[in-house]
Amino acid sequence: MCELDQLSEMGSKAAVNRRQFAAIGAMAALAAGVKAQAQAAGGLSERNVTFAAPGGTLDGFFVHPASGKHPGVILWPDIAGLRDAKKVMARRLATAGYSVLVPNPFYRSAPAPQFKDFEDWRANGGMQKVGPWMQQNTPAAVADTTKAVVAWLDQQASVDTAKGIGVQGYCMSGPWTIIGAAAVPGRIKAAASFHGGGLVGDAP
């Protein structure tokens, strides 16, 4: 699991060593290759989107196969928010035959991107910046947002409403997958939390 104290410690250690830099370079090359392959095949359609949601206007990134209807997927980013790395992940899912929305998890506070990448988050006081934003994402707020996201997805021509929606979350947003599935059980049929933080707590 990924906990807030671990994230705070990461934020105080912003330096990147040579091995980390090499890994980042390799990931960037892979990301570029995936995007170029998809674009060359002409198989994907993508766009930035905005729509009304509880507490404000939600902005996000939507990508799907260029033709046909496909199961919807909600991809909640981690604490560094909607950024290029998450768009790459969404494109990879879309190439597998899904209509993927990456919502800005902090839309109530600031439009995306809030950070260029995770290193930008670490080096520029990311934890201090997002702390107040995170407080707005209560379980009730996340449930309400998920309902709006599902409603929006179901209005898209590329989404197959006869099939269930999947939701995945990372670190901070890991619990959101469970909250979302409970909020819209008739539509969300699969939930995956990756190194989710705050999955359990002391409060009843």
Residue ranges and their predicted role:
Residues 70-78:
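Short beta-strand element of the alpha/beta-hydrolase
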Residues 84-103, 107-112:
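Short amphipathic alpha-helix adjacent to the substrate-entry channel of hydrolases
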Residues 112-120, 197-204:
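Flexible "cap/lid" loop of the alpha/beta hydrolase fold
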Residues 37-68:
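N-terminal cap/lid segment of alpha/beta-hydrolase-fold proteins
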Residues 118-166:
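Gly/Ser-rich "nucleophile elbow"/oxyanion-hole loop immediately N-terminal to the catalytic nucleophile
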Residues 16-30:
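N-terminal export leaders
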Residues 1-16:
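N-terminal secretory signal peptides
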Residues 146-204:
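Primarily recognizes the serine-hydrolase "nucleophile elbow" in alpha/beta-hydrolase
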